[in-house]
Regions:
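AAA+ P-loop NTPase catalytic core and its hallmark functional loops
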Residues: 1-190
């Protein structure tokens, strides 16, 4: 799967000048809100978009909570698209109990690493297509399992004062994946 991503990414060309330099926060919020409405027919108020932007400025890890149907998953996806970025949605399962559920696992019998959706998203974020763009990974419905169990390694790295790194998985021609600087993790829960 990861080789397919590499092949699809070769020869990527950045689309010319869709974006301009905004003058102030109000203009950024207006631009994002208008793009989200035009691209996805999603309508968020200015306060919601300002809070989301403020959160992004403060931390790389966010938890969006609210009742079903309020747009917890749609917001990061539409926001990333409005800024020319991308959001990958990783569905958390009720049975997730350890790091293998989030990071995948190595099968010693077939001598193959079975990457998870989360690792595929991290890998995609490192591809040249997204080298200078926002990339958001959404762990959707995190309330279905305990993040302390399946995401302990990720939480530990994100809370560390040093630059976060991923556990050594040895992907990409024996090079371990790096966590891109413009990668943001979002979680949703009710």
């Amino acid at each position: 799967e990861l080789e397919r991503m590499d092949a699809a990414d070769s020869g990527f060309q950045d689309p010319p000048g869709r974006f301009h330099q905004p003058a102030n926060l109000k203009q950024v919020v207006d631009d994002v809100r208008n793009r989200m409405a035009a691209d996805e027919a999603l309508f968020y108020d200015d306060r919601t978009i300002r809070c989301f932007l403020g959160g992004l400025a403060m931390s790389r890890l966010h938890l969006l909570q609210g009742i079903s149907g309020t747009g917890k998953t749609s917001l990061p996806r539409a926001f990333a698209k409005a800024l020319g970025g991308h959001a990958d949605i990783v569905a958390v399962q009720a049975g997730w109990r350890d790091r293998q559920d989030l990071l995948g696992y190595y099968n010693a019998f077939d001598k193959k690493y079975h990457e998870s959706s989360f690792v595929k998203a991290l890998y995609a974020a490192q591809c040249p297509t997204w080298s200078d763009r926002l990339f958001i990974v959404v762990l959707d419905e995190m309330n279905l399992s305990y993040i302390e169990q399946f995401g302990a390694d990720l939480l530990s790295e994100l809370e560390s004062p040093k630059k976060p790194n991923l556990p050594q998985l040895g992907l990409m021609d024996s090079r371990p994946p790096r966590r891109p600087t413009r990668l943001l993790e979002e979680g949703t829960a009710i």
